[in-house]
Structure formats: C-alpha cells, structure tokens
Amino acid sequence: MTTPPTGHPGQQFDHVKAASLPQPYAAGRYNPTVLAVCQGLFTCAISIDLTLTALTGWQLAPDKSLATLPFALITVAGALVTWFAAFLIQRLGRRLSFALGAASCCVGGLVSVWSIWHGDFWTFCAGTALVGVFQAFAQYYRLAAADAVSDEFKSRAISTVLAGGVIAAIAGPALAAWSKDLFPSALFAGAYLVVAVMGALSVLVLLLLYRDVAPSQGSADAGAQASAPARTLGRIARTPVFIASVANNVAGSMVMMFIMTAAPLAAVACHHRIDDGAAIIQWHLVGMYAPSFFAGRLVKRFGLGAVLMAGLALNLACAVTAMASTSLPAFYAALLFLGIGWNFMFVGGTTLLARSYTPSEQAKTQGFSELLRYAATALATLGAGPLLARFGWQTLNVAILPILLLSALATAYWMLGQRAGQPRPA
C-alpha cells in the first residue's frame, strides 16, 4: 500500500526519491541524528528544571508544604498529556507536534522567569507544568526514530536518539549552577531563561531539519498486517511482545526513578557529603545515556532478549551492591549499574513496543504504553522518600526485586514464543 505524502510541500520530493536513497533511513535518513540533537536539548532543559525547581518552589511558596508542588507538576502534566500527545502526533504529524511540544518548553521557561521576578508561586506552577508537556512530547522522539526504520535497525535508531542525552546529562546541572545567578535580583530566573532557550532551539531544529516519513512496515509479514483491520487495544495488550515491552519500559523506569530519587538522601544519611550525593547522580546519568552509543550494536550481535536480560541482571547487581555496603564506592557502583541497566531495558523495551503495532494502531498503543510508564514513574518518585525514611536504604533495594522478577518472567515468555516461531504481532 502506498502512503500519501504528508507535511510541508518539500517533503513530497522526499517521498518520490525515497526508494533511491540508502537504507535504513530512506527519506528520513537524518531524522535519528536530528532527534538526538533534540534529545540533548530536552535533557538539558529538563535537568535544569529537575535540579532547581524544588529550591525555587521553596523560595516562592506561600506555604512551605507546597514547595514540591511545582516539581510534582512536571511529572503530573506529562502523565496527563502523554495520551493526548500520541493522537495529536497521528493527526498533525511528528514534525509539527514535536515543535508544538518544544514551544511549550519555551513558553514554560519564560513563564517561570516572569513568576520568579514577580514572586508568583502559582504562575511558577503553570510554567513547570508546561515543561512537563514538553517532556511528554519528547518521550516520543525515540519511537519516531524506531517507526521510520525496519525491524533490523530499530534498536540502533533508538540508541542514536538516546545518545543525545550523554553530554546534556552532565551539561544540564552545570548550566543550572552557572545560570541561576545571572540576575542577582532574581535568583534562579537566569536558569529558567536557559530552559526557554533550549525549547526555542528545539523548535528551530525540528522545523528546519526534521522530515515526516511514512512508518516502516519492517517486513512482508508486517506489510500484510498493515492492510488488516486495526486490533483493539485490549487485544494488542495481550500479545507477548507488548507485555514484554511494557514490562521492561515500566519496570526499568520505575526501578530507576525509585532508586535514583532516594540515593542522594540515602548517601547523606550514611554520613557522606551532600556533594557526594550530587556526584553519584551525575555518574548515574552517564550510565543511563553512555551505553546508547553501543546498545543498538549489542542487540544486533547478541539478540534483543540477551540485552534485555543483561539490563535486568544489572539492575539486580545494583540492588545486591546497595544491600552489601553503604560505602561511597558502593553507592557509585550501584547507581552506575542502575543507569546501564535502565538503558538496556529502555532501548530493548522500546524496540519491542515499536514491533507490537501496525501503523493504524500506532497512536493508541504508544499512548497507552507511555501512560503506564508515566504512572509507574510518578508512583515510584512519590513513594521513594517515605519508604526510605521508614525502612532505610538497604531494605529499599529489596523492594525492587519483585518488580525485576515480573519483568524477567514477561521477557522470558516473549523469548519462548520467538523460539517457537510465534508470528509477530499476534
């Protein structure tokens, strides 16, 4: 079936010449690189917000019990918008939808600057919520890269996009520290101006360089299924490939946020310095994004199932290391294992998700999966502090073991189906 050209007029030429361009990317062959740049800009912006929003909230809040509300609204707004974002992308195309999402970051940053200048807490809440909207749209960057290529190249395309966060994960907190004092009379306003600039740059990059392309059908089998009636979401959700994708995306993100949120507090409680807690998180962020340079190649060499199981094993190593010792090297090692394990599970889980639907099923499947991931991440973020205070760091790590076990069982179930020659998707 031939997909009609979409987007701006220049893209029609891209569709005409697509067949003559080298695979795997055809007309959108630069899209993964463009999205990697956008991922870097997003990671810079969101890391500034995550670094300073709680402090800014404390500074502005009329009641200090509300100080963390602006921080929470980043995740809450993202969770509320993620389902809507999937259908907007289907209707308007990724180029325009992603640009609108990035524009919300620009507006949110400027609103935050204004609210700090005027000491308005509730307007600041609106600004951070708009950054949460940007986060919801940015989570689809990796899926956009995966959908544009055949099954063989999906994991590599996803890794390319996530690799954009490597430098940004380190640069973001550094930018936050540098820019927070740009305006001496308005502490933190300069940092949120940088957030607005990151959003504006993302808009320009997307509008000038990104190209909407028809989703790759991946194989002859997938091509035949593309012409079949769309399945219900319930039927898709019962397939082993979707179950395994959600198990890895949700478990990986939930465990990562649960441990990462508690780690700096636990380090200080174990008599390490506050600066050590911050350094542990930076090391963890390197672990999260640096494997993106080779995760796709590992999938091609060893297989998707092996990489997923390696991610689970690394998360288990994180828990075992944390339970064995509270020394500073143990914190560094545990958080490094956690970051790499998340990357393997996230790249692998996203690859499975991109294999679980046909083009007509894309919006609802992606939206539902991201909604589940956001909800689990929010739950982990909110629960980490109270559970750490009640049970302690080492017991906290025991709590992730059942989650990892469920993910391992779902992954093994999918792997057994693959070995038995089960058709995909079913």
Feature locations, PLM:
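Helix-to-loop junctions at the C-terminal end of transmembrane segments
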Residues: V81-R94, A290-L304, L388
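Helix-loop boundary and gating motifs at the non-cytosolic
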Residues: L21-A79, I243-N248, M256-R273, G277
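Juxtamembrane intracellular "pre-TM" segments in multi-pass secondary transporters
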Residues: H8-R29, R211-A247
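Hydrophobic core of transmembrane alpha-helices in multi-pass small-molecule transporters
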Residues: G40, F121-A136, A330-F344
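C-terminal membrane-cytosol helix-exit motif in multi-pass small-molecule transporters
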Residues: A177, A196-A220, A410-M415
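Cytoplasmic helix-loop-helix junction between adjacent transmembrane helices
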Residues: G127-G164
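Intracellular juxtamembrane helix-capping segments at the cytosolic ends
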Residues: T53, A136-V149, F344-Y357
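C-terminal ends and interior cores of transmembrane alpha-helices
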Residues: A103-H118, L314-T326
